[in-house]
């Protein structure tokens, strides 16, 4: 029995959900998201909410029950408010600049890095050391943020690198004689 799966997903008035066979389509003010359902899962509409049900008591069906419910909730939130990840660049000369759909990074390498954003992802740079990645798809926003962070992960001695805004870097102590 899934504790997450048995909770209904509330659908706001400005969101339209279309169930067709094994596909769910969620349309809202920010756009549209589509998800392919697993055969062990069914979705039932009850008024202003969606109920996710497992077809049987198999281990796979129970595992996918909570997962599908969480994915649906994220789709509804994504098309209404969207998701965002904030990155902070810490280091001398580390800079970021957003131009159209490309994020230009200077991270202490001998060359600048131009990271092209995928479809549906927007990037902003409120300051030279701050990057904001926005989009409807939670997984895609997180993946792009992880890709940008991977260019220069925070090092453990001074904390220099690209980090998430809410990330705490535990610094190591330097060796003493």
From Swiss-Prot:
Protein name: Large ribosomal subunit protein uL6
GO cellular component, as recorded: cytosolic large ribosomal subunit
Organism of origin: Nitrosospira multiformis (strain ATCC 25196 / NCIMB 11849 / C 71)
Tree of life domain: Bacteria
Record family assignment: Belongs to the universal ribosomal protein uL6 family.
UniProt keyword annotation of Transmembrane present: no
GO terms, molecular function: rRNA binding; structural constituent of ribosome
Residues annotated as signal peptide: none
Function noted in UniProt: This protein binds to the 23S rRNA, and is important in its secondary structure. It is located near the subunit interface in the base of the L7/L12 stalk, and near the tRNA binding site of the peptidyltransferase center.
Record bears the keyword RNA-binding: yes
